[in-house]
Amino acid sequence: MRRQVKKVLREKADDSMKPGWDVYQPSNDVVYAFNHYMQGSQIDAEAREKAEKAFQEAVKKHPFHNNADHTVDFHGTTVFRNAKGKVCGVLIPKALPSFATSMAADVLECAVARTSLRSALFGGVSPNSGIAGYFDYRGTPVELKCRKTSFTYEHTKEWRSVFPMIDYTSAIYKAALPDHWKAQDAAVPDVVRIHGSPFSTLTVNERFRTASHTDNGDFDNGYGVLAVLKGEYSGLSLALDDYGVCFNMQPTDVLLFDTHLFHSNTELEAKEANATWNRLSCVFYYRAALGEQPCVEEYRRRLKKAKEEKSTSLSFNHIEQKDNGENTNKPAPVYPVSLTPFSCAASAWALRGCAAAMLTRLHGLVRENASLMTELFGEPVEVADGLPRRAPEEIIPVHKHTNVQMHYLGGFSEKGDILNEAMNKRHYLDKENLQKMFGEEFVNIWTQSRTHWLQLVKKEWEHQKETNPTRTRFSWNNTSAMNFAFFDLCDVAKQLMCGAFGDREVNKKEEQSFWGMFAAHLDNACINEIGMLQGSMGMHKLNVKLKDYNFGGTRYLKDMPPEEQERRRRRRLEIEQARRRAPICDSESGDWLRNEAFDYQTEDVAVNYEREQWITPENNAKRFGFPERGVYGAEGAATGTISVLIVLPKPTNHRQKTCELPTSREADRIMKNPAAQRLLCAKPCNIGLSTSSNKSRTVLCGNIRIDKVFDGGSVGGKMYDFVIMRHLLAATTGEREPLECLVRWTSLARYCTFVVEVDLLDRHHYILKSEIGEEYSAVSEICFSALYSATYARDKVNLRTTPCLLSFIDKSGNMLESRFKFNGSPLNTVAFVVRRREK
């Protein structure tokens, strides 16, 4: 019976998987949204307009940010700090053994469900998300708080396969940020820590691109950890929105970051709109409410009950109230940093120490002296009047379906098919069916509450008929005893709903389905049990009062006299206790809803790494070279002269002949902005060097020695701290030349090389509307080639895209640390920070 009821109540939730419209409704500062199947009906223009307005209001609170909105993409092991030196994020590629993430993914995929609870972070569409471990369940209809999630309870044996990943992640956290690991480890209650780690909870997301948000409820003095377990995709970087930086992540990568900073995911980088992709990620954190007094008291209550029942399998004899710190659930303060290619490179863990100090010094100099930045890279960090930013109407919306405004305020949808479904299933709330699911005490409470309300409705209806014998519609008095009896019946029904579902929480579609069935049951009772006319009560009126109950009931309670408020609270407690005493009918997740055993840590088992021949978590963490103090601390001071080599493409004997440029909106966008016009009118930047000499020219700038040389020239066997390859690859042809160019010049850098190039891809390439993208692709190469030719006096130009350039970098034996985007650059310039791969 329980399976049958749960199946019925979930039928409408399954509609979210069907093709249809994305539905948005902002309410109480949170955007509630779900997918609605339209059954082929037409949406009028007014509804579309209202829906669009509702969506725009929604994304004001949780906006999406694209890759183009950020300046830096980190790829290698990175430690990113704010202006005060506090670590904001630590990216560690290939941090987790693949066997551990694979084992965990096989289990945690089962924890993922389509839920509307986080739809505000997904642009209004219900994403696939779930939780595992332990949770406090504050603000949910689940009456038993501070315990295992339903997933963990139901998958005890399988849960053990997650432990290696937990151990590896915890060890990495401890090695990188030991002070915060210790604070978090000391605070998390032992009864809710996952396998000895400082984590209490996992959030698992599948194919989930989040809008900008902070993780409310995480421990303030700790860090969250994000790991990608499996997937085939590009893009979806984790972005720190207030800092303009992104962390590129692929399976087995780990990111430790301050979850109280606003963060989001950038767009999926897919060549085709309907490309197949998948991504399963996991966030590890300590849910701070689990260490607060209400939860500690719940642990103690369960432990006391277990001792009274003389349980022999207790994992704890007492519960300690630990110092949980102050958890404000407020966003972290933002201390912005100015971004340059040098500060970008200084965040690379491989360049820590002396190299980072030099890079920080160079960063300070170019921020103070804009002309030095131009001397080094050929253009400033940002150009205000360069390539214009894309207008919103040029970009594909995050969710492409038409947005239809629906009003969900706690009741149910009154569409015909939904009402018919509710009427067909109303008998599931008949007494004989409920007795198969719940204990006698709870069913009696339901029966008494139902009977009491019907009696008051009958009395009120008879009075109304006496006053007006022709009356056909029931008039609902909000201040009557009948209204309060209805609220009482709703309290009972809400507990009934909890018992009918096996999920940890009831999503909006499931809740709508239940309340629709509840209303149909009551409407039928009004007709067949107390003799009201068909439609006298009606589904619409009951729906209005259900919305009143769900969103106005608390207000009405506050308006009641104190003694009535207390009576209502006692009544609700009585209902909850009756449910707790209900017998267990089967071994499904309904057991979890009523489970109040002291079963903390009963699933925990040791992992024998030696027997399995797996690398230990401690040895795995040592691979990344974190010192005992972790990644804290500032770099040392840069002393002595810093040497920089700038390599320029050699100009040809004449500038490229002016060719006929295309005329289109996209061509004008590239060629007619003021910065582009200046390039066309200015002298080529590489004309100053003597083309007859193959030797370098030296420029001194304080304690910075800058040598300049043409590609193909000689530096006399010198090595340099840093090499800047300025638009060299665009002057090469084929596959072999760019690789040879990269190998030659990167080999002269002690620390790293900046590969500066034109990027043929529009910064919004993957989300441009098709007609805009096609127009851009038709003109971009010829337009940027003309600008490049004017800047470097070249008659042969081979511009490339970022994916092509990344391929060259990899094949040349170099490692990519990061990518820096020059904002507004008329050449759409990017700088790749690369270093020679360690042998």
Swiss-Prot record:
Observed effect of gene inactivation: Does not affect growth, gene expression or the stability of some repetitive DNA sequences. The genome contains only about 5% of the wild-type level of J in their DNA. Cells lacking both JBP1 and JBP2 show a complete absence of base J.
Keyword field: Dioxygenase, DNA-binding, Iron, Metal-binding, Nucleus, Oxidoreductase
One GO location term (cellular component): nucleus
Record note on cofactor: Binds 1 Fe(2+) ion per subunit.
UniProt xrefs under InterPro entries: 2OGFeDO_JBP1/TET_oxygenase_dom, DB_JBP1, DB_JBP1_sf
UniProt binding sites for Fe cation: 213, 215, 263
Chain positions covered by the region annotation Thymine dioxygenase: 86-288
Positions contributing to 2-oxoglutarate binding: 279
Record-linked CDD domains: JBP
Subcellular location: Nucleus
Region (DNA-binding JBP1 domain): 415-583
Entry's Gene Ontology BP terms: base J metabolic process; DNA repair
E.C. number(s) listed in UniProt: 1.14.11.6
Summary of subunit composition and partner proteins: Monomer. Binds to DNA as a monomer.
Function: Dioxygenase that catalyzes the first step of DNA base J (beta-d-glucosyl-HOMedU) biosynthesis by converting thymine to 5-hydroxymethyluracil (HOMedU). DNA base J is a hypermodified thymidine residue found in the genome of kinetoplastid parasites, which is localized primarily to repetitive DNA, namely the telomeres, and is implicated in the regulation of antigenic variation. Also specifically binds to base J-containing DNA (J-DNA).
Protein name according to UniProt: Thymine dioxygenase JBP1
Species of the source: Trypanosoma brucei brucei (strain 927/4 GUTat10.1)
